[in-house]
Amino acid sequence: KGFVPDESNKLWVSDITYIDTLDGCCYLHLVTDAYSRKIVGWCLSETLHAAHTVKALKMAIDATGKGTLEGLIHHSDRGVQYCCDEYVNLLTDYHIKISMTENYNPTDNAIAERVNGTLKTEVIYREQRFTGFDDAERRIASFIDFYNDKRPHSSIGMKVPSQAHQESGEQRKCW
């Protein structure tokens, strides 16, 4: 609590959000860098199985190109996907510190919840409902590219996450 990263890959926040389609529900597993607000790992799935959460984490780890991530903190809620052996072992294998919310309180994982809200507001609620899983995956992938590379954020000085991800030092907030 209260930790403010001064560069990327110091604090990752993770969450899972429900995505409604005309065919039913699917689940978006996200890993976001708290410093840059860049979505560094994600997986859309038709189940809540931990394997999908692990896949999003592996994407984030692979994107760093590093064999160890000592000094990185991974923060999440206490969902079973984040507490399972496979997920915890992957974190510890890369020397990533584990942080979890104390109780179920969305404000304890506010950055992750904000990313969920932005995605839902700008893609899901604003546009036509997803027809099914494939449509959702295609449009979410497109939005994540837009979010990371073209959408300025007031919490990082009106820069885009991919730019902020390359920087260090305090991020100027514009709110």
Task: Please give the residue ranges for each predicted region.
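Mobile-element integrase/transposase regions
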Residues: 1-30, 55-59, 63-64, 69-70
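Basic, flexible linker segments flanking DNA-binding modules
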Residues: 1-8, 105, 160-171
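Hydrophobic "anchor" residues
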Residues: 36-39
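A short acidic/small-residue loop/turn micro-motif
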Residues: 33-34, 44-49
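C-terminal domain-tail junction helix/linker
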Residues: 92-96, 118-175
